[in-house]
Regions:
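Short loop->beta-strand "edge-of-pocket" segments that line small-molecule binding or catalytic clefts
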Residues: 14-38
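Hydrophobic hinge/microswitch elements
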Residues: 45-90, 97
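Short helix-loop capping/hinge motifs at secondary-structure junctions, enriched
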Residues: 3-12, 30, 110-113
Length: 133
């Protein structure tokens, strides 16, 4: 966020991350993601980071970033409005994390209703456009 950049500056390289803070996300108590993840030559790479705060919800993750408590890595689609309004600023653009999957949940593949399959085929291009634009 601009608040973070004003306080700590803008990270310009992976090496500079040692001088910055990331909001750590933990799905399970005591098991936080304490790294910045990126893809290089088709492989996932990680740089260990320090944090001012660790959270366990996506709402708190984004809120902590907006308040200037650290850098986050999140899908563009979830931050689009904040980025367009200038509430958040993209940094280290060339270091993209592995793409997250989007899944359909349905009761049984063996007896998948035709209307469910048709809906999945219809919605797929819209979801792709939203996520990757």
């Amino acid at each position: 966020s601009p608040k973070y950049i004003e306080r700590f500056g803008t990270p310009r390289s992976l090496k500079s991350l040692k001088d910055h803070f990331q909001v750590h996300y933990c799905q399970q108590l005591g098991r936080e993601n304490d790294y910045f993840e990126y893809m290089e030559e088709g492989k996932i790479k990680k740089v260990r980071t320090k944090a001012l705060v660790s959270v366990n919800s996506t709402e708190a993750y984004t809120a902590a970033c907006l308040e200037g408590l650290g850098i986050i890595q999140a899908p563009y689609s979830g931050l689009r409005d904040s980025l367009e309004k200038g509430d958040l600023v993209e940094v280290l653009k060339k270091y993209k994390a592995e793409a997250m999957g989007v899944y359909f949940l349905y009761s049984n593949r063996k007896f998948l209703a035709r209307r469910v399959r048709v809906f999945m085929e219809w919605v797929e291009p819209y979801v792709k456009d939203y996520i990757y634009s």
